[in-house]
Swiss-Prot record:
Residue sites binding Ca(2+) per the record: D27, D29, D31, E38
Family statement: Belongs to the peptidase S54 family.
Localization in the cell: Membrane
Transmembrane regions: 121-141, 177-197, 207-227, 229-249, 263-283, 290-310, 323-343
InterPro entries the UniProt entry points to: EF-hand-dom_pair, EF_Hand_1_Ca_BS, EF_hand_dom, Peptidase_S54_rhomboid_dom, Peptidase_S54_rhomboid_met, Rhomboid-like_sf, Rhomboid_IM_Serine_Proteases
Native source species: Caenorhabditis elegans
Disruption phenotype annotation: RNAi-mediated knockdown does not affect vulva development. Does not suppress ectopic vulva formation in a let-60 (n1046) gain-of-function mutant background.
Protein name per Swiss-Prot or TrEMBL: Inactive rhomboid-related protein 2
UniProt superkingdom: Eukaryota
Protein topology in the membrane: Multi-pass membrane protein
Primary subcellular site in the record, as a coarse category: membrane
Keywords associated with the record: Calcium, Membrane, Metal-binding, Transmembrane, Transmembrane helix
Record-level Gene Ontology MF annotations: calcium ion binding; serine-type endopeptidase activity
Length: 348
């Protein structure tokens, strides 16, 4: 195997802890940063401490020069060490984690990533995207409608949410496998891969809960407020991911990479998908309609479960209070939706 791919296994615990020790040893003012000039001098004077050979030393010097004086935090340090040592897989993991992790949480996250054994591997959202695409293509062929913005809508599918199949509880989750329209399937897959996979890499099993709570909140909100139409599509799950990421950016604005650009782009991108959902609900030239409330349910779940699931390694008072408030609000949301769903049958 190519030497650059030799690090398919995780960095061992000794090497992982040594990276933290090295960084802290040379972070003399304990501000979480090492100045580039200082690090250049350090690696020349203490090459053995870094475990570098001559070639790796040259690469690190070049990478530091390319930073043009920008200080090195622990995330940058791990990324540069991986590049210099040819740990290609580790380099990709760190690069993905940089996009979704606030700077004040990176020491904990990157320390965990160094020991990450890819068990389970971060393929849940990749696999889900493949399944969604397969179902979309199947129903496109089966319906003979072709590829367009507002269809097909497989109303007879055993996966779709409908008020006529309330006892079939699996539909509250399986509807996310069916997508209506080419724009929706592209939007959902892009969000799941671009945002969801890095989040899954950092947060692992918590992302499964976040996604499916978004799906559940979307289905019960739709049945509560718009029961006369169908619900299908992965938008609730995708909106839970995008809402969670937007919440993280908003609450850690100064700590996120490119937050000023990323936040408005995400909001506009999500708004376009929701505008299309509103069009399909009220203005599309077809009899069978699809609810737009799945998006809103996913949005609510994404915001609330960000505080429930992602509290960081050192929870602050703000996150502790937010955790309990979000937990209570989630309970109220579910209770109110179930009451509204059950009310018509109870009144008759």
């Amino acid at each position: 195997m190519d030497d650059k791919w030799r690090e398919s296994a995780p960095v061992n615990d000794i090497e992982a802890s040594s990276w933290i020790r090295i960084f802290r040893a040379f972070d003399t003012d304990h501000d979480g940063l090492i100045q580039c000039e200082e690090m250049q001098k350090t690696i020349r004077d203490s090459t053995y401490s870094f475990g570098f050979d001559h070639y790796e030393l040259q690469k690190m010097s070049l990478y530091l020069e390319m930073r043009e004086g920008k200080p090195v935090d622990f995330a940058d340090f791990c990324y540069l060490m991986s590049k210099c040592k040819g740990y290609r897989l580790r380099e990709y993991l760190f690069r993905a984690a940089l996009t979704v992790t606030p700077k004040n949480q990176r020491i904990h996250v990157f320390s965990e990533l160094q020991r990450y054994k890819c068990v389970p591997p971060p393929i849940f959202l990749i696999f889900l995207s493949i399944v969604q695409l397969a179902f979309y293509l199947y129903y496109v062929v089966d319906s003979s409608e072709g590829v367009w913005l507002s269809g097909p809508i497989p109303t007879m599918s055993p996966l779709i949410v409908s008020q006529y199949h309330l006892p079939e509880l699996w539909r509250l989750f399986t509807y996310c496998l069916i997508n209506v329209g080419i724009f929706h399937i592209i939007f959902n897959i892009l969000i799941q891969l671009a945002i969801g996979v890095p989040l899954e890499l950092v947060h692992r099993w918590r992302i499964y809960i976040l996604y499916f709570m978004g799906v559940l909140f979307g289905s019960i909100l739709s049945l509560a407020l718009d029961p006369t139409v169908f619900l299908c599509g992965g938008a609730a799950g995708s909106f839970s991911l995008i809402a969670s990421h937007i919440t993280t950016i908003a609450t850690n604005f100064k700590e996120m990479e490119n937050a000023t650009c990323r936040l408005p782009i995400l909001i506009v991108f999500a708004a376009l998908d929701y505008v299309l959902a509103v069009y399909q609900r009220f203005f599309a030239p077809r009899i069978d309609k699809v609810s737009m409330y799945g998006h809103l349910g996913g949005l609510v779940a994404g915001i609330l479960f960000t505080f429930i699931l992602f509290r960081g390694s050192k929870p602050s008072r703000f996150y502790t209070v937010s955790f309990w408030v979000s937990l209570v609000l989630s309970g109220f949301f579910i209770a109110i939706c179930i009451t509204l769903i059950a009310a018509p049958s109870m009144l008759h």
